[in-house]
Swiss-Prot record:
Record: active site: 152, 207
Binding site for substrate: 185-189
Function: Hydrolyzes galactomannan found in plant cell wall, by cleaving alpha-1,6-D-galactose side-chains from the mannan backbone. Appears to act in synergy with mannanase (ManA) to elicit hydrolysis of galactomannan. Has greater activity against galactomannans with decreased degree of polymerisation values. To a lesser extent, is also able to degrade other galactosides containing alpha-1,6-linked D-galactose, such as melibiose and stachyose.
Enzyme Commission code: 3.2.1.22
GO MF annotations, alphabetized: alpha-galactosidase activity
Keyword line: Disulfide bond, Glycosidase, Hydrolase, Signal
Record organism: Cellvibrio japonicus (strain Ueda107) (Pseudomonas fluorescens subsp. cellulosa)
Name by which UniProt lists this protein: Alpha-galactosidase A
Gene: agaA
GO biological process: galactomannan catabolic process
Length: 404
């Protein structure tokens, strides 16, 4: 035991003294937005190894793995105490088999295991944070077989965010195991301006709440519905791309909104090239929820290799139109109805022109024709004809355009 302890401490010391100025994240990860599941939205602190194993099982049997989801992420409250040498331990009551055994189980399913920590002394739920233990924790995670680290921002009043996140990035890289690094700084310090070389994604807002258009006051902080989070993405699309994504938070599909709201929520997250991290109970979700979360054509828009975040193309108040360039000259177009009533909408393509200064795409619809397919109901048509659609209240119509 003593020999193993000295070896472990020696490895940590070696990591600390060998940090290079060119330290980097693992560049081969998140070339498209990551897809997975996270425990927080539904379970909060009520997590244990039995439930996590069941979620891994459900991700496979529900068809979510086949649809592209791969990460099973444990959020806050898995932590026990640090041992006398500062190494973090899993809560032995709720994770009696240990994290290595849990990771082995998840890996045997063809999935990956994610874990949570915090840049401060304590996590948001008061468990041990990683401040001052970054290299120890990264080495521990690597030894457990962890594949994903979500790094939160509680208890950080006197910490520089860029430095704090860079330190954990360096620690993960030095630990030697590729781990996706998810920055959860809530957008308070504009991580999009400095985090491209630090993490694979960064949160752009505070926490999500399962509502269409609300701000939920928790006292000292607020959480936000679908539309407020969408609106906070204005001006951020230029920062997104393969390996570095604007993260709009875990999804609330299946957690109490209407079917149309869930479909719109999922479609918008896909268009904005946000990570698609489910936040519902995978074990008992409805067929409708499963159909939304595994919708092949929507996921294809999110996972398009160009990695271009959609732009708001046209704004007519309650009716907004988003467009996203895709591979092979294709485009995805989303009509969003923010209002409480359904809307009949007439759209003459020939009157419209699209120019995207960021991705350098442009379309003259009076000169270039596309065939379109409504990805949610299968209807087809052409941009040579006037489009007449009914956009549901709190809903979307999504078309995929392909060159004629």
């Amino acid at each position: 035991m003593r020999k193993q302890l000295l070896l472990g401490l020696g490895l940590v010391s070696a990591l600390l003294v060998s940090v290079q100025a060119s330290a980097q994240k693992f560049e081969q990860l998140a070339k498209t937005p990551q897809m997975g599941w996270n425990s927080w939205n539904t379970f909060g602190c009520n997590v244990d190894e039995k439930m996590i194993r069941a979620m891994a099982d459900a991700m496979v049997t529900s068809g979510m793995k086949a649809a592209g989801y791969e990460y099973i992420n444990i959020d806050d409250c898995w932590h026990g105490e640090r041992d006398k040498n500062g190494f973090i331990q899993a809560d032995k009551k709720h994770f009696p088999s240990g994290m290595k055994a849990l990771a082995d189980y998840v890996h045997a399913k063809g999935l990956k295991l994610g874990i949570y920590s915090d840049a401060g002394n304590t996590t948001c739920a008061g468990r041990p944070g990683s401040r001052g233990h970054e290299y120890q924790d990264a080495l521990t995670y690597a030894s457990w077989g962890i594949d994903y680290v979500k790094y939160d921002w509680c208890d950080t009043q006197d910490i520089n965010p860029k430095s704090a996140y860079a330190t954990m990035r360096d620690a993960i890289h030095k630990a030697g195991r590729p781990m996706l690094f998810s920055i959860c700084e809530w957008g308070d310090n504009q991580p999009w301006e400095w985090a491209q070389d630090v993490g694979h994604s960064w949160r752009t807002t505070g926490d999500i709440y399962p509502c269409w258009n609300c701000e939920h006051n928790h006292g000292s902080w607020s959480s936000f519905g679908v539309l407020p989070i969408l609106d906070k993405q204005a001006g951020l699309r230029k920062y997104a791309g393969p390996g570095h994504w604007n993260d709009m938070d875990m999804m609330e599909v299946g957690n109490g909104m209407t079917e149309e709201e869930d479909r719109a929520h999922f479609s918008l997250w896909a268009f904005m090239a946000s990570p698609l991290i489910a936040g519902n109970d995978l074990r008992n979700m409805s067929d409708t929820t499963r159909a939304i979360l595994t919708h092949k054509e929507t996921i294809a828009i999110n996972q398009d290799k160009l990695g271009i975040q959609a732009m708001k193309w046209i704004d007519e108040g309650d009716l907004e139109i988003y467009i996203k360039p895709l591979e092979k000259g294709h485009y995805a177009v989303l009509f969003l109805n923010r209002a409480d009533d359904a809307m009949d909408y007439r759209f003459d393509w020939s009157f419209h022109y699209m120019k995207d200064d960021i991705s350098k795409h442009e379309i003259f619809f009076d000169k270039q024709a596309f065939n379109w397919r409504n990805i949610w109901n299968g209807e087809t048509g052409s941009t040579k004809e006037v489009l007449n659609i009914k956009v549901p209240a709190h809903g979307v119509v999504v078309l995929r355009l392909s060159p004629r």
